[in-house]
From Swiss-Prot:
It is found in: Cytoplasm. GO terms for cellular component: cytoplasm. Signal peptide: none annotated. Residues 17-32, 40-55 have a biased composition (Polar residues). The lineage of its organism: Eukaryota, Fungi, Dikarya, Ascomycota, Saccharomycotina. Belongs to the TDA11 family. It comes from the Eukaryota. Residues 288-304 have a biased composition (Basic and acidic residues). It comes from Debaryomyces hansenii (strain ATCC 36239 / CBS 767 / BCRC 21394 / JCM 1990 / NBRC 0083 / IGC 2968). Residues 1-110, 180-255, 281-358, 388-413 are annotated as: Disordered. Residues 96-110, 225-238, 305-322 have a biased composition (Low complexity). This is Topoisomerase I damage affected protein 11. Keywords: Coiled coil, Cytoplasm.
Length: 463
């Protein structure tokens, strides 16, 4: 260039040098604004340096802050386009020059470990900042979070790598120890096999005579210990065997004694069932004991009559009473059969006697049920006698009666009105004197009704 360029063609902030012998440098500063008229007046600075050649760009590269140019010689005040000079300036990054940072900034610089880890200023200062500065702080905070996450990931990977290395190191050490132990054990085995005996560590300053004496003492001790240990167990074992045999024999005896009673009960039950079924299948042809059965029934006690009419006796019957119950049931069956046959013979002129098939089925059910209840009574008495060590008390063998010798007549009347439960037969017995006559009357009335029903049944069949 032979001449100086105009201010319209050159941007502000550029330095232009001319190749003339008297080298003059034109320095165009940034535009300044007057507070009154706000006219743009470029500032020009001349320098007589002979070394500078070419074009120099005095532009500071920074994403956060703009480089500050020195004020003009005229004393114009500098004001940026984004924010006022009174506002706070953010710190520059590593790319910016250190001379352009403001040392009096309230925001501290980034730490050495993390580049973007900057603490935020107070809320008042944040409110005083421009929106662009607030957005820059937001971006810095996000970058710091990302940086911290990256550091955490790096630390976790480093920790995992160190753990893997520790595990591999342990495996190597275990293998080496195993090899050493195997080698030492193999060497000791080879030495013992070559020598034929186990090598023992020799004592220092030992005398062979003393060693021989010690070995003989040890042998004698071992012999005494072995003899004592071998002699004691046989005595104990024999005692234990005798005790075990006694216990086993006792257990066997008690077991067989407990099993014998149920077996006997089962046999009795089988025989009773067989007898009942045979009796029900075989027809009754003997009619000789009709008068005897009637007399025995009239002379019977009220307890037997109530037990026979009840058709089911209590499970508390004893063995003796169960036998009498069986006999009474058999007599009743015979009596009913005789009554039915006598009524049929009166109606029929031919004198044909009906067989057992004409009997009522209720009588058969009554006989079977009475036999079953008697068997249940036997089972119960046998079980109770087997479980209890003592004999059955005498209070169950007789009928409970009211106390005698009451002086007061009212008490005597109350006792007569009460009923007593018989433990042997399982029937309720009233203490009233007129009970026997009433029971006999009811029984005769029932038998007469049954005879009439049988006669009507035969008539309907004949018709």
């Amino acid at each position: 260039m032979n001449g100086s360029t105009s201010s319209d063609a050159v941007d502000p902030g550029l330095c232009v040098t001319t190749p003339s012998p008297v080298k003059q440098t034109l320095t165009l500063g940034s535009d300044t604004f007057n507070k009154d008229d706000k006219q743009i007046t470029p500032s020009i600075r001349r320098s007589n340096s002979t070394r500078s050649k070419g074009i120099n760009f005095n532009v500071a590269i920074s994403p956060l802050a703009t480089g500050q140019t020195p004020p003009s010689s005229k004393g114009g005040h500098r004001k940026t386009a984004s924010y006022d000079a009174k506002n706070l300036h953010l710190p520059q990054l590593a790319e910016s020059s250190p001379s352009s940072t403001i040392p009096d900034s309230p925001i501290p610089t980034a730490s050495e470990e993390l580049k973007y880890d900057l603490p935020l200023p107070s809320t008042e200062q944040l409110m005083g900042l421009d929106i662009d500065d607030q957005l820059r702080l937001l971006a810095l905070k996000e970058m710091s979070i990302v940086e911290i996450k990256d550091s955490i990931g790096n630390l976790t990977s480093k920790l995992q790598r160190n753990e893997n290395e520790l595990h591999s190191l342990r495996e190597v050490i275990q293998r080496s120890l195993y090899k050493e132990l195997n080698s030492s054990s193999s060497k000791s085995k080879k030495e013992t096999s070559s020598n034929g005996f186990v090598t023992r560590p020799q004592r220092q300053n030992s005398n062979p005579r003393e060693e021989a004496i010690a070995s003989t003492k040890n042998r004698s001790r071992r012999r005494t210990l072995s003899s004592s240990s071998s002699g004691v167990p046989p005595v104990l074992s024999s005692q234990q065997l005798s005790q075990n045999t006694d216990k086993q024999s006792r257990r066997d005896s008690t077991l067989w004694s407990n099993l014998s009673k149920p077996l006997n009960l089962i046999q009795q039950f089988d025989s009773m069932l067989q007898h009942e079924f045979e009796k029900s299948m075989i027809p009754q042809k003997n009619q000789e004991g009709s008068d005897k059965t009637m007399d025995s029934h009239k002379s019977r006690h009220s307890e037997d009559s109530t037990s026979s009419l009840g058709s089911i006796s209590s499970p508390l019957n004893s063995k003796s009473k169960s036998v009498t119950g069986k006999q009474s049931n058999d007599e009743l069956d015979r009596y009913f059969a005789q009554q039915s046959t006598s009524g049929a013979s009166k109606d029929k002129p031919d004198g044909v006697v009906p067989t057992e098939s004409h009997m009522n089925s209720d009588d058969m059910i009554q006989a079977v049920s009475s036999s079953i209840w008697s068997f249940v009574n036997d089972v119960k008495t046998n079980v109770l006698s087997s479980l209890a060590d003592e004999d059955v008390p005498e209070s169950r063998s007789h009928v409970t009666k009211g106390p005698s010798g009451f002086s007061n007549s009212n008490d005597q009347k109350e006792i007569n009105d009460l009923t007593v439960y018989n433990l042997d037969t399982g029937s309720t017995v009233s203490l009233d004197k007129n009970e026997d006559s009433d029971l006999d009357y009811t029984f005769v009335h029932n038998t007469a009704n049954e005879d009439r029903a049988a006669v009507d049944h035969d008539k309907s069949k004949n018709d």
